[in-house]
Design a protein with these regions (language model features):
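Hydrophobic/aromatic-enriched cytosolic interaction surfaces used to assemble or bind macromolecules
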Residues: 1-304
């Protein structure tokens, strides 16, 4: 009997922990999952300082959640809120001869923009586009080393092996990537756990990224989305958005879709998680519980 490979994803947020077990690669199947709240005072999200204030409570919560998932899989892909790090889209004039050379050039380039000690930052990058003249477009992520080190240490104590650490916005994109990649000039707009995220692609390449925590009232969301679109259009006047996709919780989905339609003056495609994934045999989950696993499922898919 051939056993299908399974991926384990863990989302850490201000609301608590979400663990998801998935299989199937592009055709993602949910094999199990759960969300748990953390005791008050356990976590305080920060870009610079270690986030976990009560290590014992955090380790206990992770260990118990993993035990309840009834899996032997310990290698986990971890999703953190975008607010604990930074994301930069960077254009450079030449390709790198090696990844290390790339990291050195990126650090040098970023010194002018970020008044922080880049030596205390874990920096990673992904090449988005390579042009014929040798120029490259990069997606650069930055996380404080003390923040990463603490999470890795405590997750290890809880019995997990952190494999990848990524931001929630990209794990949400990863969850719907099969549909989103069918449209080359598209905007992905989501409101998830109090954060509004806007990703805009042109020619299949990520051209714009913005995420901001904001109250969920319609006027706030409208203002933030409109501001993002104004910045994008001012920066790239010749790059029209061809299609808009949106995502929100089941209760907020339809009002959010209407708000995105009003702001963009386009009819958006409302992404439905129940259509994007399947439930494995014996797995029972309602819409709200499944939505709460969104980022964890996106993270889990990275290991498949």
């Amino acid at each position: 009997m051939i056993l299908s490979k399974k991926g384990l994803g863990l989302e850490i947020s201000a609301e608590g922990l979400s663990l998801a077990l998935a299989s199937g690669g592009k055709n993602l199947t949910v094999q199990g999952g759960l969300s748990v709240a953390l005791p008050p005072g356990t976590l305080q999200l920060s870009r610079r300082e270690p986030n976990v204030l009560n290590a014992a409570h955090f380790v206990s919560a992770v260990r118990e959640a993993h035990l309840r998932l009834l899996t032997k899989e310990r290698a986990a892909s971890v999703s953190l809120p975008d607010t604990v790090g930074r994301v930069v889209l960077l254009d450079l004039e030449a390709r790198f001869r090696s990844r290390e050379e790339g990291l050195d050039i990126i650090r040098w380039k970023l010194k002018k923009s970020f008044p922080i000690d880049l030596g205390a930052v874990q920096l990673d990058y992904q090449t988005l586009d390579e042009r014929e003249n040798g120029a490259v477009s990069l997606l650069v992520s930055l996380l404080s080393r003390p923040v990463v080190a603490q999470y890795e240490e405590l997750l290890g104590e809880a019995g997990l092996e952190p494999r990848f650490i990524d931001f929630t916005s990209f794990n949400l994109y990863r969850l719907f990537s099969q549909r989103l990649e069918m449209s080359e000039d598209a905007a992905f707009v989501c409101f998830y756990r109090g954060a509004l995220t806007v990703l805009i692609f042109f020619g299949g390449v990520l051209s714009f990224y913005r995420t901001k925590e904001t109250p969920g009232e319609a006027q706030n969301l409208y203002r933030e989305l409109n501001s993002s679109l104004l910045v994008y259009r001012d920066r790239y006047p010749g790059q029209a958005i061809g299609e808009v996709f949106c995502m929100a919780s089941p209760a907020e989905a339809e009002p959010f879709r209407a708000l995105v339609a009003e702001t963009t003056q386009m009819e958006p495609v409302l992404l439905d998680l129940e259509r994007a994934v399947a439930l494995g045999g014996g797995t029972v989950m309602d819409k709200n519980a499944l939505h709460g696993l969104s980022a964890a499922l996106g993270a889990a898919s990275r290991s498949l």
